[in-house]
Amino acid sequence: MSKTHLTTDKFAQMGLEPEVLAGLESKGFHYCTPIQALSLPLLVEGHDLAGQAQTGTGKTLAFLAATFNYLLTHPLTKPRLINQPRAIIMAPTRELAVQIYNDAESMSASTGLKLGLAYGGEGYDKQLAVLEQGVDILIGTTGRIIDYFKSKVIDLSNIQVVVLDEADRMFDLGFIKDIRFLFRRMPPATERLSMLFSATLSLRVQELAYEHMNHPEHVQIEPEQMTGVRIKEELFYPSNEDKMLLLLSLMEEEWPEKAIVFANTKHVCEDVHAWLENDGHRVGLLTGDVPQKKRMKILEDFTKGTVDILVATDVAARGLHIPDVTHVFNYDLPDDAEDYVHRIGRTGRAGKSGHSISLACEDYAFNLPAIEEYIHHPIPVSKYDREALLDDVTAPKRVFRNRQPVNRNMRDRQGGGNSNNRRRPPRKS
């Protein structure tokens, strides 16, 4: 794996406690990413921090290392009840909360500090049993944390560290009232270490930092381009009739090792999933109403490689760290220009290259000007030969459509792709 995304700064130079370093090094982390190198010296000194960094820059490891380090170096000066965690880490989604928890386990093992997890959708009693035993660091979503707080399962009056991850996403999802409710139940900002991370430090995020933090230092990690220099962007203008066949043809030509296909609605995601599955791809579906256990299993399968393609709404566009994604397909151009950046940011991470392919169809092409204005450059356009799209595709039985795909010959972009009408064999299960 390329190390070009790392700095020459080592975690051992950051002033971290030996137990924290042991947890990092047990997972092979020795050198810092830019956000870690900039933020950890400030956090170790006890400064609050508001950091701007995209997902995949190493910010999770930065705030986890700082949290564990602070708790080790600042023992409580008064007795703590068993229902009083010492640190709280808030995330916008269940998947991100679970991911943070998993990333924290190595430092938990090396420091002896106990972790708790709280998120909605499932596992209330199981999570409750852990919390009732007492935890040092509580990681979770705001809604479930408030449920436990109102039930007096947890008490926030002894919080020493608070982390708010993906703050901009919290606003998007309408969780800011919950966040303010929780902040007001904690000790004042001058009596705790506070960290906020966000992909964008918008005015509303800065106001939140000003309101609930103690003169935070601002750290900003700007990509060389809004969309990342390692991501090859490509745009097609298909008709609505050609759109699905073009996606299938591109899948056949690119044959991605690991791809995410984004669509704007649940129903379109289900449609795309059915077509891809019917065409022999190993594909998973991730939308907002997929049951939690199934969501976690799909993400696990996708991460392990037993599923090659994930079809998703924007529920997966932010927060989740899914390594080694080679391709992102925007089947629908997003309505929010910022979501375009978050979507294609799933690839081209950790020093690797990636490929983003967007379809500007009749329904969503009008979103393109705002996207290109936001990213400060036009997306390169590729043409396709509609006579060269796949001609051996049939609609899946469970998808009801007014028209059937028109038989066409071959599938390439101006001469590329497989020759002699050969199809790749279906992916092996």
Swiss-Prot record:
Component of the RNA degradosome, which is a multiprotein complex involved in RNA processing and mRNA degradation. GO terms for biological process: RNA catabolic process. Its EC number is 3.6.4.13. This is ATP-dependent RNA helicase RhlB. It catalyses: ATP + H2O = ADP + phosphate + H(+). ATP binds at A53, Q54, T55, G56, T57, G58, K59, T60. NCBIfam families: PRK04837.1 (NF003419). InterPro entries: DEAD/DEAH_box_helicase_dom (IPR011545), DEAD_box_RNA_helicase (IPR050079), Helicase_ATP-bd (IPR014001), Helicase_C-like (IPR001650), P-loop_NTPase (IPR027417), RNA-helicase_DEAD-box_CS (IPR000629), RNA_helicase_ATP-dep_RhlB (IPR023554), RNA_helicase_DEAD_Q_motif (IPR014014). One of its GO terms (cellular component) is cytosol. A motif (Q motif) lies at residues 9-37. Residues 399-429 are annotated as: Disordered. Its main location: cytoplasm. It comes from Aeromonas hydrophila subsp. hydrophila (strain ATCC 7966 / DSM 30187 / BCRC 13018 / CCUG 14551 / JCM 1027 / KCTC 2358 / NCIMB 9240 / NCTC 8049). Pfam families: DEAD, Helicase_C. DEAD-box RNA helicase involved in RNA degradation. Has RNA-dependent ATPase activity and unwinds double-stranded RNA. Transmembrane segments: none annotated. A motif (DEAD box) lies at residues 165-168. Belongs to the DEAD box helicase family. RhlB subfamily. Keywords: ATP-binding, Cytoplasm, Helicase, Hydrolase, Nucleotide-binding, RNA-binding. One of its GO terms (molecular function) is ATP hydrolysis activity. Residues 243-390 form the Helicase C-terminal domain.
